[in-house]
């Protein structure tokens, strides 16, 4: 199951030492709903290896502003506490999986 990231816990998760994938989304966003099951599947596949979760941009305003998120879905990838990749828009599972594997 994908983690629930918030403005309050995001820094701690990014700085945990594990690779991180964050899906910035909103309930009203159609493309976000298309990506959501893919994020859940990847969270299960990479459980224990990569912290994979979602951050609701309507409930958490600070973090999207810090990373310049203007469109959703946007997915950010972190390694060693630094952002190393970014994907904007609905993306096929194979593409996202390759980006997650590149974090390992």
Language model regions located:
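Proteins that catalyze or organize thiol-disulfide redox chemistry
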Residues: 1-51, 59-104
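Conserved residues in the N-terminal Rossmann fold of short-chain dehydrogenase/reductase
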Residues: 54
């Amino acid at each position: 199951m994908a983690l629930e990231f918030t403005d309050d816990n995001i820094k701690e998760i990014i700085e945990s030492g594990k690779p991180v994938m964050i899906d910035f989304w909103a309930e009203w966003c159609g493309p976000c709903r298309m990506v959501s099951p893919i994020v859940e599947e990847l969270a299960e596949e990479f459980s224990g290896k990569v912290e994979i979760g979602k951050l609701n941009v309507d409930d958490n305003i600070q973090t999207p502003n810090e990373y310049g998120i203007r469109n959703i879905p946007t997915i950010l990838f972190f390694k060693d506490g630094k952002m190393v990749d970014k994907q904007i828009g609905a993306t096929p599972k194979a593409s996202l999986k390759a980006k997650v594997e590149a974090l390992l």
